[in-house]
């Protein structure tokens, strides 16, 4: 009973830390003195058939997104399709990385993820038009190395981390991803540019990217 009551009272803290970020910034510019690039990293595609070296994206603006099928933010999936389609002429590439660390909202095997997206959430025959990679961790001891690099390159926009009782990974770091659908933009030189919290509207992300592209062209 004591444990149940403790969990009950901690739950609002968890939600405040992981979902409610309105009191903080929606995005943050990355550090200016980043060492290394995403070209030092790689990943396997969702079906495991292709090993992609991220150096193949040299010259592109790349948006990294940690995704989940059964999340309240899964509605961002179709919006990411639109973002990819509209900004592809400007050199934008969207990359999705399924992760089950936040509310266990990506429970399926790699082979089940596309079916879940197509028939359950967002459903309606949805198919992502951007590359998805194998499911993996984005925080903790077993986090994918490219996310170690991205997180260390960019401060988190939110000062809230959440209730320790609901964090399933170790070690916990201040730059850790807080929830599904956080985003990192990487420039054409492979260096991270900016980072958004999960609940930032895709329309805002698009506006921020367009502003960055305009500034990038004038430099």
UniProtKB/Swiss-Prot annotation:
Write out the tissue specificity statement of the associated record: Proximal caput epididymis.
The protein's matches in InterPro entries, at most eight in alphabetical order, are given as:
Glutathione_peroxidase, GPX_AS, GPX_CS, Thioredoxin-like_sf
Its GO biological process annotations read: response to oxidative stress
User: Hey, what's the signal peptide range on this chain?
Assistant: 1-21
Keyword Transport in record: no
Q: Keywords, A to Z? A: Oxidoreductase, Peroxidase, Secreted, Signal
The protein's role, per its UniProt record: May constitute a glutathione peroxidase-like protective system against peroxide damage in sperm membrane lipids. Since the purified porcine enzyme has very little activity towards hydrogen peroxide or organic hydroperoxides the protective effect is not likely to be exerted by its enzymatic activity. Instead, may protect sperm from premature acrosome reaction in the epididymis by binding to lipid peroxides, which might otherwise interact with phospholipase A2 and induce the acrosome reaction.
> How does this chain assemble?
Homotetramer.
Protein name as catalogued: Epididymal secretory glutathione peroxidase
Q: Which organism is it from?
A: Sus scrofa (Pig)
